[in-house]
Amino acid sequence: MNNKTTLSVANPALHRKKSIVLAAGGTGGHLFPALALAEEFEDTDIDVHLITDLRCKKYLPANHQIEPHIFDFHLKMTGLANKVISLWRLSNVCIKTLLLIGRLKPDIIIGFGGYTSFPSLLAARVLRIPFIVQEQNCFLGKSNRLFAKSARIIALSYKETSNVSIYDNRKVVITGDLVRSSIRNLPIKNTFDNEEFRLFIFGGSQGAKVFSQIIPEAITELLKLNPGLKIHITQQVSQDDQKELSTIYYQLGIKYLLSPFFHNMAEIYSETDLVISRSGASTVAELVNVGVPAIFIPFPYAMEDHQYFNAMAIENSKAGWCFRQEDLTAHILAQKIYELVANRTMLKEASKSLLNRKNNGAKYLADTVLKIIE
C-alpha cells in the first residue's frame, strides 16, 4: 500500500504584495495630489512607487513612505537643437521607465498629468497594465487627453472640466481636490469682522514680480478711497523687490510683512480676510480647504491657460473673483478690494461657497484604486 502524502504548494503570485505606481512631477501642482493619494496607502500593505523628476525631488516630505524613482525630465522645446536634445532625452526616459515598470510589475499606474506622466502611461499601455489619469486642473491637459481613451478611470478634481471627449464621459469620476492631510486639517476661516483688514498676497514661483508692481499702486489708491482703513498686508516678494515695497508700505503708514517664502501658512490663512494670488491647482485646493476667498490673477503663460479655467470655475460658483493679468489695473484692483472691505458679507458668502467644494478627494480616489486592484 502506497501512503504518499501530497503537498500543496501555494502559488506565490496569489500572495504577492500589491503595488501601485504614481507618475507625477514637473511642478508641485502635479506632485502634491500624488503625495496626497500616497498618504492614503501608508497604513496598508500596498507598496507605493513614485516616478518623478529632479525638480520635484525637493517636495518629497522627509518622513514619506514612498519608493521614489527620479529621472531627468529637463525638456526645452525652444529652438531646433533644444527640441532634438529634448526628444532624445524623453525617448531615453521612456525606455528606462518601460524597463522599470516591467520590473516592478505594478497592479495599477496613476498618472497626474504633465510631461512626467507620459513615459509611465505609455509603459502602462505597452505592458497592458490598467491605469488612471487624474486631472487636478479645470482643463484636461495634453498628456491626460492623449491617454484618456485607454484609461480605466478619468479622475477629475473639478466637476466643471468640460474638455473631456463625449466618448470618455462614462469613465469619469469626480473626486474633488486631492490634498495632503497637512492642508486638509488646516483650521477653517470663521470670521471676517475684524476691524483690521488682513490681505495675503502671493504669486508663487511664476509671477510674484507683477504683483510687486501693481499691488502697491492699488493699496495707495485704496487708502485714498478709504483713508481710515486699518489694513495689514502679508506679501510674498523677491529679495530684489523687498526694500522698495517696504519703503512704499512704510510711507503709507500700514502694517506689513514681506518675505520671499512663508512657512507658517496655517497661521496666515487663519488670520487672512482676502487673498490675492495665482490660480494653480494647489493654491486653489488650499483655499477651498480653509475657506479663504481670493481675487485670482491667473498666470497668463500657464499651459493651455489652465489657471484661467481654474479661477473661472471658482468665480462661477460665487466663491472668488477672477481678473486676467492683461486686463487688470491698479484702479480696478483697488475698486474691488474697496467693495469687499465695505461689504464683508460678500467675503462670508464666498467662504461658504468655497467650503461647499471641500471633500476628501484623496480617499475617494484611493477607494477607487482598491476596487480595481483587489
PLM features: residue spans?
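C-terminal alpha-helical cap of glycosyltransferases
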Residues: 2-6, 339, 359-374
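A short, glycine/small-residue-rich beta-strand->loop->alpha-helix junction that serves as a flexible
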Residues: 22-35, 56, 209
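Active-site-proximal region of nucleotide-activated glycan assembly enzymes
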Residues: 47, 55, 125-186
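Donor-nucleotide binding loops and adjacent catalytic segments primarily
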Residues: 42, 49-51, 56-64, 187-274, ...
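An amphipathic, basic-hydrophobic alpha-helix
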Residues: 79-108, 126
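Conserved donor-nucleotide binding/catalytic region of nucleotide-linked donor-dependent transferases
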Residues: 321, 326-360
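Acidic donor-binding loop of glycosyltransferase active sites
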Residues: 106-108, 270-285, 292-293
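Conserved nucleotide-sugar phosphate-binding/catalytic loop shared by glycosyltransferases and other
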Residues: 16-25, 42-89, 239-241, 324-326
